[in-house]
């Protein structure tokens, strides 16, 4: 262990246990960095192979053009090389993904060392200033550069950050405190789970609060198209009439009747497009933030917990019926379908022919009726695990620090 590490640890009680904790972080960082370097070497090898296959493919295509008598042979070789090139692209992406994953795990372990050794300047995320006129935040150094909040700066989600801040600034009922302590004790030795959760959040990146606010507003707002039965019927009837009138025209029964169907479709679009686009915009703006949390929610839902609070949080993500991660996956697919509006060449003809936007919004609003009121709870559940993991990280780094025992009168 470096001398400066021993000097810092010697200031704290239980330094033997602290040194073992620090050694754990050091070993985890070294193992993750080694794995990342191995995957980087693998990635570089694949990249060189891709370049080689590409150059050989170009040479084969030149031969295909230059030697007409052997085009069948060179065409077959070019096809095989193209398939190999695609396979290498997939493998390269996988290698880079694993490299980044292990690199983030190494950074997580390094950050844990920095917090344990009080290397404040090395910590990446600044702590917010203390709230004005708060009764104890400034006196107890809850926020600021060298503060309790900085020691707990391993949260990886906006809901987790907000929840942890509220816990630091406000009291809790004794029963709630007992449940939190029980959950923290369960998570303290679960270093693999905590590190993987933080690494996943780092890869996802920060989510702007405004993004989540827009999506939550959309999810909790009343449906617009579902109550409009006439509009939904028209969205089915008008495209069917277009198919029927085109058939009448093709078979020379009644020509040009399809023009009426197109006029009807344009009329429906004129009456509904502005409102539909507004809903699409709100949902898709927030979706980009929520998509980053999808993997985190999936990881938490897969974990088996034992304590009351954590089991309740997990149950909130896996209610009877469709699990939160699966439901979010469906929502993402619907929002991707709504993105057709960004393709100017395809959107107008497809929308005129099928009233595509109405059908997509119907699916999104049915999802909203089923899960919209649960979305905020899913974010809160994720925030609970994130905040409790940060507290567990502090408990793991300082094994001799006490858990207060509350006595009820």
Regions found by a protein language model. Name each.
Residues 2-409:
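Alpha-helical bundle segments enriched in helix-capping/polar residues
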